[in-house]
Structures are given as structure tokens and as C-alpha cells.
Amino acid sequence: MSRRTERVASLLQHELGAIFQLELPRTPIVTIVEVKVTVDLGIARVYISTIGTPEEQAAIMAHLQEQNKYIRKLLSQRIRHQFRRIPELEFYEDHLYEHARHIEQLLSQVRKAPVDDAETPLD
């Protein structure tokens, strides 16, 4: 990513976080993990993490898709003096934290498992 797209992505991540926190209070807890912007700044891919059951997470994603135009409008009001055109928003669910937590659980199980010395091969 170029320096420009990185700066734009960082700004969008900050502003979207503020929008979710201040202007969309009914939206459940959503963490913006990352924002990736295309080179032409036409599309912003917003990767989010949510807490809850898979059904709740699906409902949150559906809610964000329904509110997409409204969120973009709020974003436009906040950054319109910095951009000629506000990027289209695409929301994606990020499962990185869930995978990391699962790996941690597996590692803790391995650490707790008793080691049978009779079965370990000697070199």
C-alpha cells in the first residue's frame, strides 16, 4: 500500500470508529480491525470484529449492510473537506481474534496434557 492509501485508511478507521461509538449507539459493540483502501480511493474495505454467537454476528453484519448508505453519509459529513469523493464502504467480518483464541485454547490443552515418557522416542 502506498503512503497515501495508508493515511486515508487510518483516517477512515478513526472516523468510522467515532461514528459507531457516538452516532450509532444502537449498533452493538463493533471493533474496526482494519481498513483497506483501493489505489483509486474508490472502495474502502472495512474489516470488523464482533462479539457474540454466530447468529448475533450475522445479525450485526446484516445491520451494517442495511445502514451502509447512512454510515457513508455520516462519514461524508465528517471528512467532506478532505476528499472529493467518499469511498464506497464494504464491510467484512474479521475472524482473526477468534482463530487466535482457538489456537491459544489448543496450546493450553497441550501444555496441560501429561507427557508419557514411555512413548517418547529417544534419539
UniProtKB/Swiss-Prot annotation:
* Tagged with keyword Cytoplasm: yes
Q: Give its localization.
A: Cytoplasm
SUPFAM superfamilies from the UniProt entry: Ribosome-binding factor A, RbfA
Q: Which Pfam families match?
A: RBFA
Matching entries from InterPro entries are given as: KH_dom-like_a/b, RbfA, RbfA_dom_sf
Please indicate if the UniProt record lists Cytoplasm as a keyword. Answer: yes
Q: Using the record for this protein, list the coiled-coil segments as residue ranges, or answer none.
A: none
* MF GO annotations: ribosomal small subunit binding
Which keywords does the record carry? Answer: Cytoplasm, Ribosome biogenesis
Q: What is its main location?
A: cytoplasm
Q: Which GO terms describe its biological process?
A: maturation of SSU-rRNA
List GO terms (cellular component aspect): cytosol
Which family, according to the similarity comment? Belongs to the RbfA family.
Subunit structure, as described in the record: Monomer. Binds 30S ribosomal subunits, but not 50S ribosomal subunits or 70S ribosomes.
- What function is annotated for this protein? One of several proteins that assist in the late maturation steps of the functional core of the 30S ribosomal subunit. Associates with free 30S ribosomal subunits (but not with 30S subunits that are part of 70S ribosomes or polysomes). Required for efficient processing of 16S rRNA. May interact with the 5'-terminal helix region of 16S rRNA.
Please identify the protein, giving its name as recorded.
Ribosome-binding factor A
Question: What is the protein's species of origin?
Answer: Chlorobium chlorochromatii (strain CaD3)
Provide the organism lineage as a comma list. Bacteria, Pseudomonadati, Chlorobiota, Chlorobiia, Chlorobiales
Q: Gene symbol?
A: rbfA
